[in-house]
Curated annotation (Swiss-Prot):
Keywords: Ribonucleoprotein, Ribosomal protein. GO terms for cellular component: cytosolic large ribosomal subunit. Belongs to the bacterial ribosomal protein bL17 family. Transmembrane segments: none annotated. GO terms for biological process: translation. Part of the 50S ribosomal subunit. Contacts protein L32. InterPro entries: Ribosomal_bL17 (IPR000456), Ribosomal_bL17_CS (IPR047859), Ribosomal_bL17_sf (IPR036373). This is Large ribosomal subunit protein bL17. Disulfide bonds: none annotated. It holds the Pfam family Ribosomal_L17. One of its GO terms (molecular function) is structural constituent of ribosome.
Amino acid sequence: MRHRNSNRKLNRTSSHRQAMLRNMANSLLRHEIIKTTLPKAKELRRVAEPLITLGKDATLANRRLAFSRLRDRDIVGKLFNELGPRYQTRNGGYLRILKCGFRVGDNAPMALVELVDRPELATDGEVVTAE
């Protein structure tokens, strides 16, 4: 019986799943947009959104908690110095999951995961804010 089991197993052991979600959260916070399968994207949302909420309050305890979950100093710095202030007025809903077709090899549903209100790059490489 699967009563009260709230997360997807994704055909991985618990340590592999934890490492994969940690790496995906690091990639998302670094690049602000990633492409992955739809079930992984939905699980990533459960990991990444609380981290961004944590980044809105830059205390030492929150930095240590974020580092224990991400294990990357550069990403923790970006989380508290750049992403936290950016989403200070937003109460949740920091990620957008867009379905983008199916993968060629196995027909798995794919999705783009991106941060809402991220600055978009123009064609000439300048940063343009999203309207």
